[in-house]
């Protein structure tokens, strides 16, 4: 009986030692490598991509025959839409300001007559206006990728007249300006029974 208890104790001890040995042999899990913070260029480029997606999708959602829609003729009681831009003019205006702001960063001149920020009056077709818009965002991505920690607050000639503005202002204001007019375009779409693409998953 005494021998049986001794053998049981030895077996238990061997099992414990084996388990400890296996645990000791198992390699330690390496600590996760800290993720490098994004560059300023990457942050700005991401913001450009966000407004580009929302704005271009909204522009493409409006049918050709309604591209020059403005609410001036709706005769909504209590409303005053006199002088507001048409849908097409909203798109051209934002694209033009994009060219002005991002061109200030890259040194590129606007590809067409900016017409005081309203874009070329001769450009009237949906296809041409949407291409003009997409080209402006292509310049935006190029401008974003040129911004560094060293030059982000560096000054460039203001496209709005005399004086200078920083590259950071060009980047942030171009995005804010786009979303400002995007809100107007969303209303125009809904006035025509069109759900904005960004809202279609929520309806």
Task: State the predicted function of each range.
Residues 24-40:
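N-terminal pre-domain segments of enzymes
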Residues 50, 54-57, 61, 139-146, ...:
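Solvent-exposed, charged/polar functional surfaces in cytosolic regulatory/catalytic domains
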Residues 45, 49-56, 68-117, 157-203:
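Short, contiguous alpha-helical
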Residues 19-23:
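Boundary at the C-terminal end of the N-terminal hydrophobic targeting segment
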Residues 47, 120-158, 166-181:
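Acidic/histidine-rich alpha-helical segments that form the ligand environment
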Residues 60-69, 143-153, 190-197:
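Surface-exposed helix-capping loop/turn segments at secondary-structure junctions
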């Amino acid at each position: 009986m005494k021998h049986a208890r001794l053998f049981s104790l030895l077996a238990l001890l061997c099992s414990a030692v084996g388990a400890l040995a296996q645990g000791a042999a198992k390699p330690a899990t390496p600590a996760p490598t800290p993720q490098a913070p994004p560059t300023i260029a990457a942050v700005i480029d991401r913001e450009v991509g966000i407004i580009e997606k929302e704005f271009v999708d909204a522009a493409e959602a409006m049918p050709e025959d309604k591209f020059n829609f403005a609410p001036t003729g709706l005769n909504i009681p209590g409303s005053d839409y006199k002088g507001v831009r048409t849908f097409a003019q909203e798109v051209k205006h934002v694209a033009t300001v994009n060219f002005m702001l991002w061109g200030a960063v890259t040194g590129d001149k606007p590809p067409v007559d900016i017409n005081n920020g309203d874009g070329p009056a001769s450009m009237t077709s949906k296809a041409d206006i949407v291409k003009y818009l997409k080209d402006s965002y292509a310049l935006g991505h190029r401008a974003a990728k040129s911004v560094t920690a060293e030059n982000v607050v560096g000054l460039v000639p203001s496209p709005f007249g005399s004086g200078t503005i920083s590259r950071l202002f060009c980047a942030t204001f171009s995005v804010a300006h786009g979303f400002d007019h995007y809100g107007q375009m969303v209303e125009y779409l809904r006035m025509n029974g069109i759900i904005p693409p960004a809202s279609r998953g929520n309806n």
